[in-house]
């Protein structure tokens, strides 16, 4: 009997990369594998994508794991380096790094390195989180061009704040700032992540940085799914029924008795709970698939178990397969039901969930 298991479909992952190349045919691909590849497994994901042009991570430790695992493609530190003492490692490993503040720039100017570092200057075009403000960017860029430790030319990167809101006007403003600053500069350019790839073809430039859409999940909050853009779900969260019980009309189930059956029925108990990372906030009615059939969660999600209403005529039995999200049940639907973003759902699964890779 299978307990909580994440099944990762390598074929779907490769399909999605190819689909994104079709959407941005003139751009190179930075496959973003931060946060353990959005919960899909850092090394296995990178090894599944030998055709990616580069990989993007948030921490130096992630980049080092890629190198130790045999990944030789360029690796971009999306948030840059956090300590000047890391620069020799970045140089020796040929990592690319974002540079977004005075402390990082000064560290580069003062370092003694055997080889220069490939730099992506981060321009704050409107996210207002990381990056050099436009009014300070000219002088900052000039110092990078004069720095002996920076491989020339300097590349330029930014990030959209509201790419998933095509009518708000913010993305057009960010693009205008980005284009104005990049004009006449020789380096590579990148501003589009998942939302930019899908909705803003004029933002694709030299490199795009697919994140959640690479894993077949829509970055938009408009009830779309990855399938709407030709992508396939890579992760399926699965488990099994561990019991099937007769349940009488008028009886509650679970902690607090929050759900009471209106009919005689059969309940299934699934080996899954918030101890595995499934959202405790999932309300009654949240769907799961049992033997490929959609049935509702009933009662509260517990640490280790979830109850589902199989229906009075159900023939399901202990040991039968359950899909909590993934193939046949998009995680975007679970996000909508639970009010927990799909980003959080797929990245917060706990260590007791087994990982299985299939082709």
Swiss-Prot record:
Q: Which GO terms describe its molecular function?
A: alanine racemase activity; pyridoxal phosphate binding
Q: Which organism is it from?
A: Shigella dysenteriae
Q: What is this protein called?
A: Alanine racemase, biosynthetic
Catalytic residues identified in the record: 34, 255
Q: What does the function comment of this entry state?
A: Catalyzes the interconversion of L-alanine and D-alanine.
EC number(s) per entry: 5.1.1.1
What the entry lists under PROSITE patterns is as follows: ALANINE_RACEMASE
Subunit (UniProt): Monomer but homodimer in the presence of the substrate.
Question: Which cellular component appears as one GO term in the record?
Answer: cytosol
- Look up keyword Cell cycle and say if it applies: no
SMART domains (UniProt xref): Ala_racemase_C (SM01005)
């Amino acid at each position: 009997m299978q307990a909580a298991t994440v099944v990762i479909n390598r074929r779907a992952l490769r399909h999605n990369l190819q689909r994104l190349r079709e959407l941005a045919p003139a751009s190179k691909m930075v496959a973003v594998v931060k946060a353990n590849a959005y919960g899909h497994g850092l090394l296995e994901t990178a090894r599944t994508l030998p055709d990616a042009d580069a990989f993007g991570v948030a921490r130096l430790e992630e980049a080092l794991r890629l190198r130790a695992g045999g990944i030789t493609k360029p690796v971009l530190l999306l948030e840059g380096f956090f300590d000047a003492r890391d620069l020799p490692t970045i140089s020796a490993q040929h990592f690319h790094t974002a540079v977004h503040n005075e402390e990082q720039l000064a560290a580069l100017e003062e370092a003694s390195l055997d080889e220069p570092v490939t730099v992506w200057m981060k321009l704050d075009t409107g996210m207002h989180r990381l990056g050099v403000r436009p009014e300070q960017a000219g002088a900052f860029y000039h110092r990078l061009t004069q720095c002996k430790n920076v491989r020339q030319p300097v590349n330029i990167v930014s990030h959209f704040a509201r790419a998933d809101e095509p009518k708000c006007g913010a993305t057009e403003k960010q693009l205008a700032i980005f284009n104005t600053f990049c004009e006449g500069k020789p380096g590579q350019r990148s501003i589009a992540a998942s939302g930019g790839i899908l909705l803003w073809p004029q933002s694709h430039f030299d490199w795009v940085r697919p994140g959640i859409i690479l894993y077949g999940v829509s970055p938009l909050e408009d009830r779309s799914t990855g399938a709407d853009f030709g992508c396939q779900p890579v992760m399926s969260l699965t488990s099994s029924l561990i019991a099937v019980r007769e349940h009488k009309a008028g009886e509650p189930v679970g902690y607090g008795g929050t759900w009471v059956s209106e009919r005689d029925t059969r309940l299934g108990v699934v080996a899954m709970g918030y101890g595995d990372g499934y959202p405790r906030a999932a309300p009654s009615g949240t769907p799961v698939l049992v033997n490929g059939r959609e049935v509702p969660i009933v009662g509260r999600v517990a640490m280790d178990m979830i109850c589902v209403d199989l229906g009075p005529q159900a023939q399901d039995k202990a040991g039968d397969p359950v899909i909590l999200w993934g193939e046949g049940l998009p995680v975007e639907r679970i996000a909508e039901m639970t009010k927990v973003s799909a980003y959080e759902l797929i990245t917060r699964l706990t260590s007791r969930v087994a990982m299985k890779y299939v082709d």
